[in-house]
Amino acid sequence: MLFLFTISAYFIICSLILDKSKKSVLKDQIGINKEHGIFPSDFFSIYGSSCYFNMGVLCIFSTLFVLLINGDLNGPTIGAIFSMAGFGCYGKNLANSVPLIIGVSLASLISISDINSPVTVVCILFSTGLAP
C-alpha cells in the first residue's frame, strides 16, 4: 500500500518539478478531465508533463477504491492499478473512469461473487480500459 502511494506521489512531484508554473498543472488537470479520451488522445503531446499529475491521481484513486471495498492488494490488483495509471497518459482520466467503476461495482452486487473478491476487484479496475 505504501509503495503505491509512494509511486503516486512520485508522479505528482515529477509533474510539479518538470512543469514551469505550478498553476498550469492544475489548469491542465482540469483540461485533461474535460477530454473525452477518444482515439487518438495523447495527453503527453497535448499537456506535457502535466499528464504525470493525472497518472498520480488515477493511481491514488484506484488504490483508495481497492482499500475502501476491503479488496486485496495482490499481484493482479497492483497490475490493474498500474494499468490505470499508465493509461493516464493516453486517454484515461477520472471523468471517464469513475462512471465505469460505479457501473461495474453496481453490476457486481447482483453477481455471485462479493465486491471485494480478487476477481471482481480486478474486473472493476480493468474495466476502466474501456474508458480511453
Task: Outline where the language-model segments fall.
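Alpha-helical multipass membrane-protein architecture
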Residues: 1-132
